[in-house]
A protein has these predicted regions:
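ATP/NTP phosphate-donor binding region
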Residues: 1-91
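Conserved active-site and cofactor/substrate-binding residues in soluble primary-metabolism enzymes
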Residues: 17, 21, 29, 46, ...
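Predominant activation on well-ordered alpha-helical scaffold segments within soluble catalytic domains
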Residues: 23, 49-52, 63, 78-81, ...
Length: 221
């Protein structure tokens, strides 16, 4: 696959080895101390530590929060917010699927403006820009890295709350490695010009797709 970038309106970088550009993204944000938010599975796989090592090698401090569960709760946001405040970090890196993305965006609000994320439920209640955030999706999931939403589970009401704000459009992100975002465009009828563009950019023979998993593992090693 040939690396490429497009702006919608966030800057999105796509391509094998893009994770190595994380320090470059952070420097453009003026960041020097990262809070890396992810889940336990990617920590066990070594992906979290690899991302952290890139930042450390560039002279940046890194704190890690990996207690994000599927369908993350208000309590998880509160814990991650406290971890961010205690760390002294000045930007957030979200790594994983939709759950870490939603938590990171919520922390970007509560760590800056205070209160509980429940106070921002609904539309346009976030008063300004959130804490600088780099999102690194590893799944073909909700697309939280490019949306104006954060969805958090409120167990006290047995309810999923949604925070909508144009301020969630992140300062930067690095869209890395995972071909699952693009593979569907090999077979589906393109609904939009962007789909056709992505399908054309995915220069990978269909007969070789069986080896994709092994290829992805090598890219992380």
């Amino acid at each position: 696959m040939n690396p490429f970038e497009f702006f919608i309106p966030q800057n999105i970088t796509v391509g094998a080895g893009t994770l190595a550009k994380l320090p470059e993204c952070a420097k453009k944000l003026g960041g020097s101390h990262a809070m890396l938010i992810s889940g336990p599975t990617l920590r066990k796989m070594g992906v979290v530590d690899k991302a952290a090592d890139y930042l450390k090698d560039a002279g940046m401090a890194v704190d890690i929060f990996t207690d994000v569960e599927a369908n993350p709760s208000v309590t998880t946001v509160e814990k991650a917010t406290e971890a961010y405040k205690d760390s002294g970090a000045d930007f957030i890196v979200a790594l994983g699927g939709g759950s870490p993305m939603d938590v990171a965006k919520a922390v970007g609000v509560t760590a800056k403006y205070g209160g509980s994320i429940t106070e921002y439920e609904g539309a346009n209640k976030v008063p300004g820009k959130i804490i600088p955030l780099i999102a690194i999706p590893t799944t073909a999931g909700t697309g939280s890295e490019v949306t104006a939403f954060s969805v958090i589970t409120d167990h006290s009401r047995d309810y999923k709350l949604t925070v909508f704000s144009m301020n969630f459009f992140l300062h930067m992100r690095s869209w890395i490695l995972n071909f699952s975002h693009l593979l569907r465009h090999l077979w589906q009828q393109p609904a939009e010009s962007m789909h056709l563009f992505m399908r054309r950019r995915l220069m990978f023979p269909q007969q070789h797709l069986l080896f994709l998993t092994q290829w992805q593992r090598k890219q992380w090693s």
